[in-house]
């Protein structure tokens, strides 16, 4: 009888031990940026990006082992000012291919173009596991480096099943933001990332996420964008508008054979006359033209001062110019018809 009691007790203890060890598996895909940067001084802001590899990033946060089984992979190690279509396609394909091998993904990334990568992945990832992007505003050698705790919170988010089916997420400064709406709003502030039109999805406190809302637009598996067979993306450039603007940048993009042009307009996406005329001509000859705005909040609406249908233009809605460029690149893999492109902008 005593033998059976001891056996049962041992089985119970082993069961509890197994449950404690059953942590989620999280894959960290590292791309570089300030979070992987290093400098010569703990108190000065000068540093070099991409000096720290993914293994050192993970080892700098030993608390990660308490919340997940973490595996790191170095995709690239660059400043995000050098982010490009090839890395975007690599990330999307890798996540889609490895979706069944892990419980969630964390992507470490520079903050300069994080919002663009987040939106691209939000449109192209076909995985129902959490995908979380994270970075830092201060290098790893800074006295008050924000990267380690941001990384911890990102893994917390990726390990939480409640983070699934919310699109690609950005976690910075205790805040969870959605990949479509998030933007960088300050050059140096650690609280730089905000969803300026709709607010955050949630907040993180003491390792727990309090979700407030879900993304309103379609994302990930609910989009038609399949990059599995793509090796390059359509060429799309951005033209900036201002008082007495030159039309030379717009003409240069047209002459270079760009497939699409996004106008960073004034006000409600308005254009200086010479730029307007150049883009109207371009639209008639098959170049996709999207009107966005340099104004940080609000929407660029259809048919306000500009008759979009008449000129073959597309209104970007709440997408800023850099995000409108991302969606136009993907839209052009589906169609060149401006009316159909407008429908895509209305949905995603």
Swiss-Prot record:
Signal sequence range: 1-22
Domain of life: Bacteria
Induction or repression: By cAMP and anaerobiosis.
Main location: periplasm
Enzyme class: hydrolase
InterPro entries the record matches: AsnASE_II, Asp/glu_Ase-like_sf, Asparaginase/glutaminase-like, Asparaginase/glutaminase_AS1, Asparaginase/glutaminase_AS2, Asparaginase_C, L-asparaginase_C, L-asparaginase_N
Binding site for substrate: 80-81, 111-112
Reaction equations catalysed: L-asparagine + H2O = L-aspartate + NH4(+)
Localization of this protein: Periplasm
PANTHER family in alphabetical order: 60 KDA LYSOPHOSPHOLIPASE, L-ASPARAGINASE
Family: Belongs to the asparaginase 1 family.
Additional free-text comment from the UniProt record: E.coli contains two L-asparaginase isoenzymes: L-asparaginase I, a low-affinity enzyme located in the cytoplasm, and L-asparaginase II, a high-affinity secreted enzyme.
UniProt-recorded name of the protein: L-asparaginase 2
């Amino acid at each position: 009888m005593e033998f059976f009691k001891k056996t049962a007790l041992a089985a119970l203890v082993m069961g509890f031990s197994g449950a404690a060890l059953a942590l989620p598996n999280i894959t960290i895909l590292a791309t570089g940026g300030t979070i992987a940067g290093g400098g010569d001084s703990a108190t000065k802001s000068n540093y070099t990006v991409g000096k720290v590899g993914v293994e050192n990033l993970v080892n700098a946060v030993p608390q990660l082992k308490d919340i997940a089984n973490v595996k790191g992979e170095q995709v690239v190690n660059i400043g995000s000012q050098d982010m490009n279509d090839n890395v975007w396609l690599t990330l999307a394909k890798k996540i889609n291919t490895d979706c069944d091998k892990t419980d969630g993904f964390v992507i470490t990334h520079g903050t300069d173009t994080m919002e663009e990568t987040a939106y691209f992945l939000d449109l192209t990832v076909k995985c129902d596991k959490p995908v979380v992007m994270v970075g830092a505003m201060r290098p790893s050698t800074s006295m008050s480096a924000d990267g380690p705790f941001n990384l911890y919170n990102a893994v917390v988010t990726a390990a939480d099943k409640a983070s699934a089916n919310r699109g690609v997420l950005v976690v910075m400064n205790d805040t969870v933001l959605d990949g479509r709406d998030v933007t960088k709003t300050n050059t140096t502030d650690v609280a730089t990332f905000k969803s300026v039109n709709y607010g955050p999805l949630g907040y993180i406190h003491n390792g727990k996420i309090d979700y407030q809302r879900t993304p309103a637009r379609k994302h990930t598996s609910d989009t038609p964008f399949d990059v599995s067979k793509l090796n390059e993306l359509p060429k799309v450039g951005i033209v900036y508008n201002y008082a007495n603007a030159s039309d030379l940048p717009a003409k240069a993009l047209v002459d270079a054979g760009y497939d699409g042009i996004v106008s960073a307009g004034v006000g409600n996406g308005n254009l200086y006359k010479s730029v307007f005329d150049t883009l109207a001509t371009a639209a008639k000859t098959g170049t996709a033209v999207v009107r966005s705005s340099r104004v940080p909040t609000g929407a660029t609406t259809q048919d306000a001062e500009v008759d979009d249908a008449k000129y073959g233009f597309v209104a970007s809605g709440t997408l800023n110019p850099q995000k409108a460029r991302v969606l136009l690149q993907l839209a052009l893999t589906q169609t060149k018809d401006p009316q159909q492109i407008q429908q895509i902008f209305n949905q995603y």
